[in-house]
From Swiss-Prot:
<keyword id="KW-0560">Oxidoreductase</keyword>
<feature type="site" description="Lowers pKa of active site Tyr">
    <location>
        <position position="69"/>
    </location>
</feature>
<comment type="function">
    <text>Catalyzes the NADPH-dependent reduction of 1,5-anhydro-D-fructose (AF) to 1,5-anhydro-D-glucitol.</text>
</comment>
<feature type="binding site">
    <location>
        <position position="35"/>
    </location>
    <ligand>
        <name>NADP(+)</name>
    </ligand>
</feature>
<dbReference type="InterPro" id="IPR020471">
    <property type="entry name" value="AKR"/>
</dbReference>
<dbReference type="InterPro" id="IPR018170">
    <property type="entry name" value="Aldo/ket_reductase_CS"/>
</dbReference>
<keyword id="KW-0963">Cytoplasm</keyword>
<dbReference type="InterPro" id="IPR036812">
    <property type="entry name" value="NADP_OxRdtase_dom_sf"/>
</dbReference>
<feature type="binding site">
    <location>
        <begin position="246"/>
        <end position="258"/>
    </location>
    <ligand>
        <name>NADP(+)</name>
    </ligand>
</feature>
<comment type="subunit">
    <text>Monomer.</text>
</comment>
<dbReference type="Pfam" id="PF00248">
    <property type="entry name" value="Aldo_ket_red"/>
</dbReference>
<comment type="similarity">
    <text>Belongs to the aldo/keto reductase family.</text>
</comment>
<dbReference type="InterPro" id="IPR023210">
    <property type="entry name" value="NADP_OxRdtase_dom"/>
</dbReference>
<feature type="binding site">
    <location>
        <position position="175"/>
    </location>
    <ligand>
        <name>NADP(+)</name>
    </ligand>
</feature>
<protein>
    <recommendedName>
        <fullName>1,5-anhydro-D-fructose reductase</fullName>
        <ecNumber>1.1.1.263</ecNumber>
    </recommendedName>
</protein>
<feature type="active site" description="Proton donor">
    <location>
        <position position="40"/>
    </location>
</feature>
<keyword id="KW-0521">NADP</keyword>
Length: 301
């Protein structure tokens, strides 16, 4: 199993015009892990940045760890390989280091990423993520991807997958939203107890209902004490919990700042204070899919 680099560059909501440069800056600064997805509709631009840096000799392909995700409209077994090949072509790569099932929910196949009925609810596909997983395993066997994993799975869903009869390849990670306001302790303990790593997306929070994690008084106090930025504290917090972290930025100075997190350590008291901020505040709730049989957030974790 490949070791996933601890800090990666997230590319969600990075506009195509900005993301090529962001990737090039990141590679120059030492990033080797890049988190992509079909849904972000910017994979070809990410690929351009990677290709240029390989061509310049700054980095070799085997030094990079490139992740992408299978979108929900491709959960039918017969569509999984097509989706993966589309992503590989967009990124201009021969293989992915890691391919994730983006959400446990399958949607009706077609040209709409999120097919909705008249009442604004998602139209599901009649698929099971357990069947989808078999097609994911085939991708590893065929050499298109090196590792496979999941994203946004709750503990029951992950448990069902790990206990699937005839499981050939285990998921190596569960990529989930995680920050001090949603610290995910139960789910992380569950994953780590079963040798599944956890990758934290939205580690810097972002905003919903005007909630800005970076303005939190406790986080600012700890940042000041260490002479670091709030973002660096939020990233370091997850590293010390043995998580992989994928902060997103297209700003060169923030891309640099987000990886300068290995020259200091949070104290036990800092960690306790950060953990105590939990308020179960989920930002990525995907409300149009709440009707789906595999919606992951109806249970506690």
């Amino acid at each position: 199993m490949h070791q996933i680099p601890t800090v990666g560059l997230g590319t969600w909501k990075a506009s195509p015009g900005e993301v090529t440069d962001a990737v090039k800056v990141a590679i120059n600064l030492g990033y080797r892990h890049f988190d992509c997805a079909y849904l972000y509709h910017n994979e070809s631009e990410v690929g351009m940045g990677i290709k240029e840096k390989i061509k310049e000799g700054v980095v070799k392909r085997d030094e990079l760890f490139i992740v992408s995700k299978l979108w929900c409209t491709y959960h039918k077994q017969s569509l999984v390989k097509t989706a993966c090949i589309n992503t590989l072509e967009a990124l201009n790569l021969d293989y992915l280091d890691l391919y994730l099932i983006h959400w446990p929910m399958g949607f009706k196949p077609g040209d709409k990423d999120i097919p909705l009925d008249r009442s604004g609810k998602v139209i599901p596909s009649h698929t099971s993520f357990l069947d989808t997983w078999e097609a994911m395993e085939d991708l590893v066997i065929e050499g298109l991807v090196k590792n496979i994993g999941v994203s946004n799975f709750n503990h029951e869903q992950l448990d069902r997958l790990l206990n699937k009869p005839g499981l050939r390849i285990k998921p190596i990670t569960n990529q989930i939203e995680c920050h001090p306001y949603l610290n995910q302790k139960s789910l992380i303990d569950f994953c780590h107890g079963r040798n599944v790593s956890v990758t934290a997306y939205r580690p810097l929070g972002g905003s919903r209902d005007g909630v800005h994690l970076m303005d939190d008084i406790v986080i600012r106090k700890i940042a000041k004490k260490h002479g670091k930025s709030p973002a660096q504290i939020l990233i370091r917090f997850q590293i010390q919990r043995n998580l992989i972290v994928i902060p997103k930025s297209v700003n060169p100075s923030r891309i640099r700042e987000n990886i300068q997190v290995f020259d200091f350590e949070l104290t036990e008291k800092d960690m306790e204070e950060l953990l105590s901020l939990d308020k179960n505040l989920r930002l990525a709730t995907f409300p149009s899919t709440e009707n789906h049989k595999d919606y992951p957030f109806h249970i506690e974790y």
